[in-house]
Curated annotation (Swiss-Prot):
PROSITE patterns assigned to the protein according to its UniProt record, in alphabetical order: GAMMA_THIONIN
Pfam families the record matches: Gamma-thionin
GO biological process: defense response to bacterium; defense response to fungus; killing of cells of another organism
Stated family: Belongs to the DEFL family.
Described purpose of this protein according to its UniProt entry: Strong inhibiting activity against C.beticola and other filamentous fungi. Little or no effect against bacteria.
Name of this protein: Defensin-like protein AX2
Length: 46
């Protein structure tokens, strides 16, 4: 299963998974992906 949460650090529209992941890494979450609506979501195994 994958746990998900919105990134606290990412601001603006999310177009790059790499930038999103960098923001999530600052929050100690290993993965980040841009979602529909240009939101950055952090993901990790539960």
């Amino acid at each position: 299963a994958t746990c998900r949460k919105p990134s606290m650090y990412f601001s603006g529209a999310c177009f790059s998974d790499t930038n999103c992941q960098k923001a999530c890494n600052r929050e100690d979450w290993p993965n980040g992906k841009c979602l529909v609506g240009f939101k950055c979501e952090c993901q990790r195994p539960c």
